[in-house]
C-alpha cells in the first residue's frame, strides 16, 4: 500500500520518441488516481519526460500531446535520413507543439511543482529548473531539456542567459534515489512503472540514473528512441504505458475508483413469470462471476479521447498525392533521385536556418569566441603542466645516460682519477665547465688505458751470434730500439 499520508514525487525518464509511453502512464494516473497527481509535491522530467511532466502539471490535453508525438515521428519518417535530414528541425517542431498545446497560464501552474532537468554547458553539471516567469520561458526550458548536441544542432539554446543541453546527459531520472519518488521509464529495469519483460537476465545498465535491463526488447527500444518506429508501434507503446501504470496502481492498492457502468444493477421488468425471473437471476450470477475479468479488460483500454487522438494521428490521409507517393514506381524513382535532390534540399534548409539564426548571430558568435578561447587556454595550460612535469626528469635522465656512456672501466693504476672526479664536479658552478672537465678526464683515462707496460721475456730480444764451438758467452741484454720506456 502506498502511504498516502506522506509526500511523494513523480519522475519521468528521458527516452526520445518513446515519450509516448509516458503519455499512457500519465493518462492512467490522471484517470484512475487523480489524487496521486494533484497531491504530488514535485513532478520531474528530463528530455522527453519533461514534455509529459509539463503536460501533466499544467493540465494540458494528453490526447493532443500523444498525437503530437506521433505526428512528429511521421514527419521524421518521411525523409531519407529520418530526423537527421537537414530539412527536419526538431527544435522548431517541439516549440510549435508546445505553443499549441499548453494553456496560457501554464507557467503559473508549473511554478514550484514542475522540475525540468537540464545540463549546463559550461561545467556539465545538472540543474533542475522549477520557477518560470512566462509561458515562453517554460517552453524554452523544455526546448533546452530536449536539445541533444549534434542531433538537434551545434549551438545550444539559452535560458536566462545560460547555455543548456539535454538534461538526460547529466541526470536522466531526477530524484530517483528518494524512496518517495515514483519513477517512470519505458525501459524494463528497476523503475516503479516500466515494462515487465520476460527475461531471466539479471544484469542491468545504469545510464545517468536510469536502470536498463540487458535484453533484446530494451535493445529494440534504445534503437527507436532517436529514430522513431511506425505510428502503430508508438500507439502500442502508449497502451503498454497505460497498462503498466494500471498494474502499479493495483499493486499498491491505489485503484479504488469503481467503474459506474459495471456498478449498475440489471434492469428487470415488473411483469414477468417465475421462469423468466429465474433465468435473469442465473444470468446475474454469471455476470457477477465475470465482472472482475470484464472490469480489468475495460480498465486496460485507453481513454476514449486519447485513443481517438492516437487513431487519428496514425491514419494516413487518403488524398491523391499520398496515394501516388506510396506507389512502388514513385518510391523507386524518389530513392534514385536522392543523390541529386539531397544537396538541393540541404542548401534550401541551410538558407532558411541561416535567416532564422540572424537575430541571434551576435550572441552566438560571442559565445563561440569565448568557448574557443577557453578551450585553447585549457590546452595551453595542460601542455605547460605536462612539460613542467616531464622536462626536469628528461634532463636528469640525459645527464645520467651521458655519465653511463662516457665513463669507461678504470684500471687499478688510474684509480686516482675516479677519486678526484666528484671533487671538481661539486666545485664547478657551470654545467658547460663540468662537461669540458669531463671530456678532458675522459681523454686522460683513454691514454692511460692504451699506455700499457709490455714485459718481454729475456730471451725474446737477445741478439744471438752465429753458433761456434768457441764463443759461448752470452751477450748482455739491451732494450730494443724504438720503444719508449713506460
Curated annotation (Swiss-Prot):
Motif GXGXXG boundaries: 14-19
Highest rank taxon of the organism: Eukaryota
Motif DGA/G: positions: 166-168
InterPro entries named in the record: Acyl_Trfase/lysoPLipase, PLPL, PNPLA2, PNPLA_dom
PTM (free text): Phosphorylation at Ser-406 by PKA is increased during fasting and moderate intensity exercise, and moderately increases lipolytic activity.
Description of how activity is regulated: Stimulated by PKA-dependent PLIN phosphorylation.
Recorded coiled-coil stretches: none
Record-given protein name: Patatin-like phospholipase domain-containing protein 2
Organism whose genome encodes this protein: Mus musculus (Mouse)
Classification of source organism: Eukaryota, Metazoa, Chordata, Craniata, Vertebrata
Amino acid at each position: 500500500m502506498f502511504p498516502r499520508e506522506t509526500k511523494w514525487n513523480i519522475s519521468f525518464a528521458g527516452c526520445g520518441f518513446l515519450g509516448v509511453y509516458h503519455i499512457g502512464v500519465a493518462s492512467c494516473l490522471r484517470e484512475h488516481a487523480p489524487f496521486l497527481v494533484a497531491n504530488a509535491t514535485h513532478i520531474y522530467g528530463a528530455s522527453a519526460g519533461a514534455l509529459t511532466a509539463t503536460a501533466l502539471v499544467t493540465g494540458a490535453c494528453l490526447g493532443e500531446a500523444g498525437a503530437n508525438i506521433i505526428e512528429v515521428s511521421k514527419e521524421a519518417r518521411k525523409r531519407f535520413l529520418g530526423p537527421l535530414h537537414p530539412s527536419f528541425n526538431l527544435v522548431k517542431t517541439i516549440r510549435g507543439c508546445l505553443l499549441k498545446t499548453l494553456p496560457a497560464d501554464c507557467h503559473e501552474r508549473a511554478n514550484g511543482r514542475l522540475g525540468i532537468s537540464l545540463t549546463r554547458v559550461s561545467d556539465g553539471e545538472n540543474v533542475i529548473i522549477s520557477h518560470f516567469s512566462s509561458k515562453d520561458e517554460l517552453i524554452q526550458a523544455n526546448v533546452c531539456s530536449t536539445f541533444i548536441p549534434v542531433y538537434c544542432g551545434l549551438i545550444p539554446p539559452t535560458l536566462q542567459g545560460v547555455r543548456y543541453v539535454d538534461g538526460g546527459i547529466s541526470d536522466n531520472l531526477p530524484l530517483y534515489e528518494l524512496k518517495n519518488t515514483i519513477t517512470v521509464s519505458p525501459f524494463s529495469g528497476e523503475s516503479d512503472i516500466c515494462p515487465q519483460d520476460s527475461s531471466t537476465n539479471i544484469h542491468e545498465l545504469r545510464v545517468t540514473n536510469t536502470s536498463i535491463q540487458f535484453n533484446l526488447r530494451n535493445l529494440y527500444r534504445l534503437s527507436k528512441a532517436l529514430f522513431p518506429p511506425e505510428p502503430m508501434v508508438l500507439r502500442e507503446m502508449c497502451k503498454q504505458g497505460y497498462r503498466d501504470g494500471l498494474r502499479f496502481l493495483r499493486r499498491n492498492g491505489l485503484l479504488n475508483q469503481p467503474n459506474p457502468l459495471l456498478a449498475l444493477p440489471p434492469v428487470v421488468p415488473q411483469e414477468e413469470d417465475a421462469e423468466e425471473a429465474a433465468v435473469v437471476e442465473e444470468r446475474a450470477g454469471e455476470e457477477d462471476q465475470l465482472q472482475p475479468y470484464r472490469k480489468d479488460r475495460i480498465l486496460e483500454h485507453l481513454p476514449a479521447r486519447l485513443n481517438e487522438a492516437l487513431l487519428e494521428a496514425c491514419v494516413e490521409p487518403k488524398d491523391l498525392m499520398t496515394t501516388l507517393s506510396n506507389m512502388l514506381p514513385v518510391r523507386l524513382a524518389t530513392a534514385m533521385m536522392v543523390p541529386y535532390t539531397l544537396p538541393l534540399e540541404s542548401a534550401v534548409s541551410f538558407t532558411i536556418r541561416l535567416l532564422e539564426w540572424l537575430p541571434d548571430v551576435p550572441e552566438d558568435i560571442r559565445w563561440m569566441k569565448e568557448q574557443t578561447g577557453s578551450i585553447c587556454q585549457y590546452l595551453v595550460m595542460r601542455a605547460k603542466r605536462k612539460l613542467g612535469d616531464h622536462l626536469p626528469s628528461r634532463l636528469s635522465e640525459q645527464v645520467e645516460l651521458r655519465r653511463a656512456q662516457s665513463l669507461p672501466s678504470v684500471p687499478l693504476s688510474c684509480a686516482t682519477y675516479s677519486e678526484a672526479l666528484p671533487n671538481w664536479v661539486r666545485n664547478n658552478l657551470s654545467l658547460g665547465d663540468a662537461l669540458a672537465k669531463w671530456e678532458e678526464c675522459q681523454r686522460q683515462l683513454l691514454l692511460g688505458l692504451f699506455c700499457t707496460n709490455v714485459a718481454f721475456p729475456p730471451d725474446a730480444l737477445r741478439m744471438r751470434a752465429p753458433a761456434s764451438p768457441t764463443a759461448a758467452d752470452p751477450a748482455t741484454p739491451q732494450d730494443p730500439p724504438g720503444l719508449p720506456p713506460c
